[in-house]
Amino acid sequence: MKIKTRFAPSPTGYLHVGGARTALYSWLFARNHGGEFVLRIEDTDLERSTPEAIEAIMDGMNWLSLEWDEGPYYQTKRFDRYNAVIDQMLEEGTAYKCYCSKERLEALREEQMAKGEKPRYDGRCRHSHEHHADDEPCVVRFANPQEGSVVFDDQIRGPIEFSNQELDDLIIRRTDGSPTYNFCVVVDDWDMEITHVIRGEDHINNTPRQINILKALNAPVPVYAHVSMINGDDGKKLSKRHGAVSVMQYRDDGYLPEALLNYLVRLGWSHGDQEIFTREEMIKYFTLNAVSKSASAFNTDKLLWLNHHYINALPPEYVATHLQWHIEQENIDTRNGPQLADLVKLLGERCKTLKEMAQTCRYFYEDFAEFDADAAKKHLRPVARQPLEVVRDKLAAITDWTAENVHHAIQATADELEVGMGKVGMPLRVAVTGAGQSPALDVTVHAIGKTRSIERINKALAFIAERENQQ
């Protein structure tokens, strides 16, 4: 049997991390078994579905490189198929027309609740032989079995059973002729030959209804697996108050897709004590029986740790392709300065996100208007004038501009003046970067370049001279 899974989001908003994890698990299961992964857009909610949301879902899937083998399919383009199946069910007696008014249904609901009963349709039209005009408004309901139970072996939670007496006759076509979500899902899974449905636990109550419809159609019933929800670190359901919940927001905040995928796969699944997984390892080791039944807690600090790991572990040239977008957002002109791959090597240890890297790298490419006030007050003092003059001249004398030779120039300055490296290094750092912190000074000065470094040292000396005149 060929394994076939699907990811079927509703385009009413962005792709959130819960949906991304479900997509990842479905994708991994298919890839692990050499099967196929289908993308289906469940856009039957015409009022809430938007083209922007569809685009956001596609963007998120593409950014995570969760490529699909079929689709995207759109439910709104399959209404003729759904209605043909409903008409067939009406002929076979597995569905019926219901003419009950909203007022009657509301009164029935209130009566049942007053008795402490679970609100459900009482089947009045199921057994009615009243004649109705062809144009009289009606819905179509599925004639759910009235006895027995529905049992399915959830691949994560184990056997789950629902009594058919708890399930009422589901509406499968509205009065306007449009099919309902639960019915469309059934026909789609049937037509697309889905073998395994991996989805959130909020769909568990839909499963027995969908199984009953599949059986009424003599269609194969897929295997189901329901993934637990994701909570914030406070134990409450993950929401915007816990930080970013949109996949593309994590892109915007400077996370690598490898980091988010690695974090999401471990958010409810484990393989021994291993924390870091390549995409190939995820595919190789992923199984549904290793997915936890318990809710997972989203921990941003852990994601940040993973992101920092991947910034330094992945090839700098690859990381640079993702950094480029953030550089563009900061409007930094990188034509005069180090290659982005070299910048990744320079700042990788210091920066936990690509956004942070882009926001702190400007001095490598563009001159700064002024020095950081605190750093200048502390290090650009009259006592720093001589070390800066000497190191400037030694840097100017370098014919082979390498980080090693820059280091020798700084060391030689300290030796000549008989001072510690800090007495030279700190004023030099503020002079060339405008700030009190940077990567290792020799590689920083080397990356900034000879001409620009000397110009900035002269600017710092002018700043010191002006400071002396004001005293």
Curated annotation (Swiss-Prot):
Pfam family, one: Anticodon_2
UniProt-recorded Gene Ontology molecular function terms: ATP binding; glutamate-tRNA ligase activity; tRNA binding; zinc ion binding
Biological processes annotated in GO: glutamyl-tRNA aminoacylation
Chain span(s) of sequence motif 'KMSKS' region: 237-241
Catalytic activity: tRNA(Glu) + L-glutamate + ATP = L-glutamyl-tRNA(Glu) + AMP + diphosphate
Domain of life: Bacteria
Cofactor(s) needed for function: Zn(2+)
Keywords of the record: Aminoacyl-tRNA synthetase, ATP-binding, Cytoplasm, Ligase, Metal-binding, Nucleotide-binding, Protein biosynthesis, Zinc
NCBIfam families assigned: gltX_bact
Self-association and partners: Monomer.
Name of the protein this chain belongs to: Glutamate--tRNA ligase
Organism: Escherichia coli (strain SMS-3-5 / SECEC)
